[in-house]
Amino acid sequence: MNTAYIISAYRTAVGKAPRGLLRFKRPDELAAETIEYMVNKIPALDKSRIDDVIVGNATPEAEQGLNIARLISLMGLKTDDVAGVTVNRYCASGLETIAMATAKIKSGMSNCIIAGGVESMSLIPMGGYKPIPDYKIVSQGKEDYYWGMGLTAEAVAKQYNISREDQDKFSYNSHMKALKAQKEGRFDDQIVPIDINHTYVDEKNNKCKNKYTVTKDEGPREGTNTDVLNKLRPVFSKKGTVTAGNSSQMSDGAAFTLIMSEAMVNELNLKPIARMVNYAVAGVEPRIMGIGPVKAVPKVLKQSGLNLNDISLIELNEAFACQSLAVINELGLDKEIINVNGGAISLGHPLGCTGAKLSVQLFDEMRKRSLNNKYGLVTMCVGTGQGAAGIFEFVK
């Protein structure tokens, strides 16, 4: 069986949605600019030798429809030769694409694939424009199939006894870690600069242009403290504990990896940065979807022949503070190695992009810590009751 290596990995900064810095950029453009930047960093690679572009997207409609992956390939690679396919596993979509690319290369079906994800929550609302539940299913008592994520978070908080105080403290720490990471420049190497050219009409009906470059995640809040977080009202239940402050931020962003067979890596004399060791998904009750990693992580560890003591760093998607804490508690995870530079509560959660974004952050942090030949874990809960987890080995 072939070995598949990740050669390059980049992401955009994450913009707030719906009124953040990336709201004027279409998702196909955002992703195309990201892969163009990444591929241009590898002059030895003939773009026509890329077999496919696999793009994760959680809401593939409107500006994200029409098989956005193929459009991204055409726009970003400037060639007709490279195909594209769009993948949807909600919040795990970006990680799923890396697993798909790895599997195809290991099997010999491909030699070189771009894999990642993109999401514009500024342009496409959560769940899409017109979700239509099956009311026969609802009438049979399965309404949790269609629950909003906030309701599932409240269910997790209640079932796993996660207090409001602990949720707010977790959220505060997420912001503090992210702010510290930004000040230290720990994200700088992984972020693709995105130029925005925005034309608008001012209050005097004059046509104006606004130009700027996005290079920094918008989410981390300098003035956040536990007192501020404690004063926020519950969003999903009057007597609940889940607030806007202890939930992930709606966001815009893109992240991509370039994955190659070992033979192609050697031919082009390139240096790999990581390889996906294994990947697993698992199902849980939709009403407590946030607990998904509790089933997915043991599964991927078993498939890899590893245990938690073998894992040096963990990127756990912070969909909500309550579900993150429940996962940490249930799995007995070491908090010191989880989201060392903050998570989705502070940095944002651009749905279909997130799995790839967390992978990019993991590789870069493992490089900075010289964790050569060590293992890292990316995991997240997934809507409608799923969990996903991928284990990577940092290679030097």
What is each model feature region?
Residues 27-43, 68-72, 97, 149-156, ...:
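Short, well-ordered amphipathic alpha-helical segments that serve as non-catalytic structural scaffolds
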Residues 11-13, 24, 28-33, 44, ...:
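N-terminal extracellular/periplasmic Venus flytrap/periplasmic-binding protein-like
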Residues 1-27, 224-291, 302, 360, ...:
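Condensing-enzyme catalytic core mediating Claisen C-C bond formation in acyl metabolism
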Residues 25, 57-111, 132, 144-151, ...:
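Conserved catalytic cysteine-centered active-site region
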